[in-house]
From Swiss-Prot:
Binding positions for Mg(2+) 2 per the UniProt entry: 298, 300
Protein name: Carbamoyl phosphate synthase large chain
Gene that encodes the chain: carB
Residues engaged in binding Mn(2+) 3: 823, 835
Domain MGS-like: 933-1068
Ranges where the ATP-grasp domain occurs: 133-327, 674-864
Region (Allosteric domain): 933-1068
Binding site for Mn(2+) 4: 835, 837
Binding site for Mg(2+) 3: 823, 835
Pathway per the UniProt entry: Amino-acid biosynthesis; L-arginine biosynthesis; carbamoyl phosphate from bicarbonate: step 1/1; Pyrimidine metabolism; UMP biosynthesis via de novo pathway; (S)-dihydroorotate from bicarbonate: step 1/3
GO molecular-function terms, A-Z: ATP binding; carbamoyl-phosphate synthase (ammonia) activity; carbamoyl-phosphate synthase (glutamine-hydrolyzing) activity; metal ion binding
Subunit relationships: Composed of two chains; the small (or glutamine) chain promotes the hydrolysis of glutamine to ammonia, which is used by the large (or ammonia) chain to synthesize carbamoyl phosphate. Tetramer of heterodimers (alpha,beta)4.
Lineage: Bacteria, Bacillati, Bacillota, Clostridia, Eubacteriales
Region (Oligomerization domain): 402-549
Native organism: Clostridium botulinum (strain Langeland / NCTC 10281 / Type F)
Role noted for this protein: Large subunit of the glutamine-dependent carbamoyl phosphate synthetase (CPSase). CPSase catalyzes the formation of carbamoyl phosphate from the ammonia moiety of glutamine, carbonate, and phosphate donated by ATP, constituting the first step of 2 biosynthetic pathways, one leading to arginine and/or urea and the other to pyrimidine nucleotides.
Length: 1068
């Protein structure tokens, strides 16, 4: 069935900000879908609130609206643009929920908008737990014994009937949000109450736990004629009970018999046919490891995290094919874009193994509860490809950037076998290392399989790796012969991993490899197991005989990607990498990307000329460089992951384009940077690097408290803190020196000033600043967690001139060619520099979109030797636009148990939204709504606990809230303060006092908003920490910065109405 000619203009809903459970995979699928629609001559209108995405670029859709993803704003776009169709399945859970709401409220009918692809009825059957269960029983597909409940009593009755443990799954939520496994009635009370609150329809499925069964997924495509293919099946190494987003996943499945494979494949197709899916769908099964019994867990009637993985694992462009199916094409009419000979109805065949390992944010949150369960906690993931499971797994382990090149982890060596057992029975992100340690101590394989629920097939593979590691540990380098080294390399061991075990340097192993000619060859991912030639291939390394890479003689550049999404290094860096590649291609240069993240646009098959899906380690990158012999390597756009390779590449005499390794060092090494600032006569907050607790105390005495302390060479403010007295400083320093004895700790005088930031481009002679950005929160809140305003609202002309002068001096002083990011503080009329990053930063996509300056494109051309004056955007500070744009951070702390919520110098946000308006108030209003910060709620109760040095500042804000009709609950001192000002307040007992106390007030739903300015951020023993956590877990707003609170209250005061606001198409 060819293209439906009635479809002329399609609205695509994006997935909004990156949160745990919904990351970069929807930028990848959304971009692919928009391109698929445009290829067919269809006009595409996009709404998405996330500025850090490729899909919101002006060339991806015809009209781009960076507006809040709410029914009100989507309706505005529909009313203005009048699309005839809506494609709902590309924006993750956010997009689906919005589409259902638009349908239910009659908005789609009112404007005559048809849903294309999977229908709303089918989406509901897939998402609504009750409808889904009814469909399954109608077609005789087994589901787990379960009950749908909408209140607490029914939930308890069901649990008592079938016994604990019980799995709680709320309807219409993301990444297992609000769900969990309840082992007792007390746990059920807590999980069920939250689940009912977070489900948009107040509905929760309680099901009998089949913890320990295998979890298997099928990624299936179906068209309107009922043709169905399975793109890929995947096996979770971790059993049911750990969310699939937190599981290690392998494709294709390794332990299913042919009968099991076919049985679940038939079930998947049966389910898609009965629900009437048109497009892609993910089906999850629980399979009893001891029989052929299985049960359907759930389906995702949309593209998902798993479909991004399946796409990258097979080379089959699921989102693009789904967009064509939505236009009316059938699978046998859609060409496979990788081969351009075969059609989309060919099932991909894999002659390799793919492993996905999640990337968790626990390095950012030391006190977090790391135990994995049904609620997803990973921020991102890596994918590794190998010719065998061991190779893919070891590649995956080193791709995580956790400093692990083997399965050995020092901290598990000290544990007893009982302690190790506990670590694998309640598995956390490090469970594989605990499991390896058990195997190292000859613990029986069948016992390990029994207590972990991991199939013996995988345990055997892990044991082989452990045995080889032990053998290496007991050997000397002279014992390593050609045959053994070849076998280790074939199974994925890295030079560094082998060297560490033999106590030699990686260089020694590299030398032996070169003598014996043990070098990797590269194989192709081509969707068809090599049966047809692929026109846009990507590659993985293996130690086989036949090499499939054709190396050209063209001028070529390698761009190093940024690896997995994590807090501090998110999708913004993928945005920069992709734009760099596009700029190089425009200049006729062959481009090669190296990256390992399956969720991103940069690893899509048709972005670069060649893609290497490899770990971003020294060895793996060097192998590719030696193979391709590029004219240069670009590191500036891959965040800290890429920058870390600068010194290594310099040692190997490999040319890097743009800023050199020595120049990077000048910006990142504290002493060299201080010398430069002195030479340039640029002020910075006083401070220095210290090597002991005693030095620190002495320096703090000189500077005067408060002081800012942090490790050197970090990303996203990791390990930074503001300390107010000696006790706090000693606590911080003793911990910091314990973690890292090799580098100094930096200690600065903390200035409570206005923070200002620039991303600039330098060609070695001039600089261009696309825009000066101002932070709403004062210095001390990490720039990635601050609300950012552009153009600036409170910065004088003199200071702006000084910013340009300092930026130029610094860029030329360091010798920057390309990007530089500088953060300033304005304090009492003076300008200080607090940080310089010699690379692209996370604000690049935001400032590119709102200033309309193609920053990455210009920076790339400058790195290749062009001059700013010839590129059409001039030099100096670029002219300011009329519209005001704010970037508002979005947090995922609710999904991470026992994690600090409080804003401070260490970054915590996972994503961001954009608010665009004619005035700052309008922009902030949209930004807050986009970030799901409640500003519409009329009246309510504020729980306030304010520390002493913030009380004076809090009063005028409290008075404003009071005049808006808000009631107050407060602890003794804050209550006294409010009473003195004539504000009515209910006093509540402190945490240490008897019930009912402050936590009970939160748990009894007496509060709508918590305002808590912390006395000491990161110590979870403090009351403030428990108050903030209790509030976040009840889905309440928690505000810890008075600057943010003041902005929210000012906006509430203005009483802005949705209907009076304009929406802006940013595509022109």
């Amino acid at each position: 069935m060819p293209l439906n000619k009635d479809i002329k203009k399609v609205l695509v809903i994006g997935s909004g900000p990156i949160v745990i459970g919904q990351a970069a995979e929807f930028d990848y699928s959304g971009t692919q879908a928009c391109e698929g629609l445009k290829e067919e001559g269809v006009e595409v209108v996009l709404i998405n609130s996330n500025p850090a995405t490729i899909m919101t670029d002006k060339k991806v859709a015809d009209k781009v609206y960076l507006e809040p993803l709410t029914v009100e704003f989507v309706e505005k776009v529909i009313a203005k643009e009048r699309p005839d169709s809506l494609l709902a399945g590309m924006g993750g859970q956010t997009g689906l929920n919005l589409a259902v709401e638009l349908y239910d409220k009659g908005i789609l009918k009112k404007y005559g908008v048809n849903v294309i692809g999977t229908s709303i009825e089918s989406i509901k059957e897939g998402e609504d737990r009750e409808l889904f269960r009814n469909v399954m029983s109608r077609i005789n597909e087994p589901v787990i014994q379960s009950e749908i409940v909408t209140d607490m009593e029914d939930g308890k009755d069901f649990a008592n009937k079938i016994g604990y443990p019980i799995i709680v799954r709320p309807a219409y939520t993301l990444g297992g949000t609000g769900g969990g496994i309840a082992e007792s009635e007390e746990e059920l009370d807590e999980i069920l109450a939250l689940g009912l609150q977070l489900s948009s329809i107040g509905q929760v499925l309680l099901e009998k736990s089949v913890k320990g069964w295998k979890e298997i997924e099928y990624e299936v495509m179906r068209d309107s004629r009922g043709n169905c293919i399975t793109v890929c099946n995947m096996e979770n190494i971790d059993p049911v009970g750990i969310h699939t987003g937190d599981s290690i996943v392998v494709a294709p499945s390794q332990t299913l018999s042919d009968k099991e494979y076919q049985m679940l494949r038939s079930a998947s197709i049966n389910i898609l046919n009965s629900i009437g899916i048109k497009g892609g769908c993910n089906v999850q099964f629980a399979l009893n490891p001891n029989s052929f019994e299985y049960a359907v867990i759930e389906i995702n009637p949309r593209v998902s995290r798993s479909s991004a993985l399946a796409s990258k694992a097979t080379g089959y462009p699921i989102a693009k094919v789904a967009s064509k199916i939505a236009l009316g094409y059938t699978l046998d009419e859609i060409k496979n874009a990788v081969t351009e000979k075969t059609y989309a109805c060919f099932e991909p065949s894999l002659d390799y193994v793919v492993v996905k390992i999640p990337k968790w944010p626990f390095d950012k949150f030391q006190g977090a509860d790391r135990v994995l369960g049904t609620k997803m906690m990973a921020t991102g993931e890596i994918m590794a490809i190998g010719s065998n499971f061991e190779a893919a797994f070891l590649k995956g382990t080193r791709s995580l950037e956790i400093g692990k090149y083997s399965l050995e982890h020092k901290k598990f060596r000290e544990l007893s076998i009982e302690e190790l057992k506990t670590r694998v029975i309640s598995p956390d992100d490090e469970r594989i290392f605990a499991l390896a340690e058990m195997l190292r101590r000859d613990y029986r394989m069948d016992k390990v399989a029994e207590i972990t629920g991991i199939d013996k097939f995988f345990i055997k593979k892990f044991r082989w790796i452990v045995e080889e590691e032990q053998r290496l540990r007991l050997s000397k380098i002279d014992d390593l012969d050609k045959e053994w080294l070849y076998k280790l390399k074939k199974k994925g061991f890295s030079d560094k991993g082998i060297a560490d075990m033999l106590k030699v340097s990686p260089e020694d192993i590299y030398r032996l490899r070169n003598i014996w000619r043990i070098n990797p060859i590269y194989k192709m991912v081509d969707t068809c197991g090599g049966e047809f030639e692929a026109l846009s291939p990507y590659y993985y390394s293996t130690y086989d005989v036949y090499d499939e890479v054709e190396v050209s003689k063209n001028k070529k550049v390698i761009v190093i990607g940024s690896g997995p999404i994590r807090i501090g290094q998110g999708i913004e860096f993928d945005y920069a990498s992709v734009h760099c590649v596009k700029a190089l291609k425009k200049l006729g240069i062959e481009t090669i990307i190296v990256n390992n993240n399956p969720e991103t646009v940069s690893t899509d098959f048709d972005v670069s000329d060649k893609l290497y899906f490899e770990p971003l380690t020294e060895e793996d990158v060097l192998n590719i460089v030696e193979k391709e012999k590029p004219d240069g390597v670009i590191l500036q756009f891959g965040g800290q992951t890429a920058i870390k390779l600068a010194n290594f590449l310099k040692e190997k005499n490999i040319p890097t384009l743009g800023t050199t390794a020595d120049q990077i060092d000048m910006a990142e090494d504290r002493e060299k940077f201080d010398e430069l600032l002195e030479k340039l006569k640029i002020a910075r907050p006083k401070g220095k690097g210290i090597w002991s607790v005693e030095d620190g105390l002495e320096e703090a005495k000189k500077l005067g408290f408060p002081v800012l302390v942090r490790p050197s060479y970090v990303l996203g403010g990791q390990g930074m803190e503001i300390t107010h007295d000696e006790k706090e400083l000693v606590y911080y320093l003793s911990n910091a020196f314990q973690k890292d004895k090799k580098n100094p700790i930096l200690i600065d005088k903390y200035l409570m000033g206005r923070e200002i930031e620039v991303d600039a481009i330098s060609d070695g002679e001039d600089v261009l600043i696309p825009g000066i950005m101002e932070h709403l929160e004062r210095a001390g809140v990490h720039s990635g967690d601050s609300i950012t305003m552009y153009p600036t609202q409170n910065v004088s002309k003199d200071i702006k001139e000084k910013i340009l002068e300092y930026t130029k001096k610094l860029a030329l002083g360091i010798g920057i060619k390309g990007m530089i990011n500088i953060q300033f503080i304005e304090f009492q009329g003076n300008l200080y520099v607090i940080e310089v990053n010699p690379r692209a930063s996370r604000t690049v996509p935001y400032i590119s979109k709102v200033s309309k300056v193609p920053i990455v494109d210009i920076a790339t051309r400058v790195m290749l030797g062009e001059k700013l004056n010839d590129l059409g955007y001039g030099v100096g500070v670029y002219k300011e636009p009329e519209l005001i744009s704010v970037k508002v951070p979005v947090f995922s702390t609710q999904k991470l148990p026992r994690v600090e919520v409080c804003l401070g110098p260490e970054m915590k946000s996972t994503g961001e939204v954009l608010g665009v308006g004619k005035t700052l108030d309008e922009a902030l209003y949209k930004g807050f709504i986009g970030a799901n910060i409640s500003i519409k709620k009329e009246k309510g109760t504020v729980l306030a606990t304010i520390n002493d040095h913030d009380k004076e500042e809090f009063l005028p804000i409290a008075k404003k809230l009071h005049s808006l009709g808000y009631k107050f609950i407060a602890t003794s001192k804050t209550a006294e303060l409010l009473k003195e000002e004539g504000i009515e307040v209910k006093q509540v007992r402190k945490l240490k006092e008897e019930s009912p106390n402050i936590i009970d007030t939160i748990k009894n739903d007496e509060v709508d908003l918590v305002v808590n300015t912390p006395t000491k951020g990161n110590d979870s023993k403090r009351d403030g920490f428990h108050i903030r956590r209790a509030a976040i877990e009840r889905n309440l707003g928690v505000i810890t910065s008075l600057d943010t609170l003041k902005a929210i209250v000012d906006i509430k005061f203005k009483e802005i109405k949705d209907e009076t606001l304009y929406i802006f198409d940013l595509s022109n």
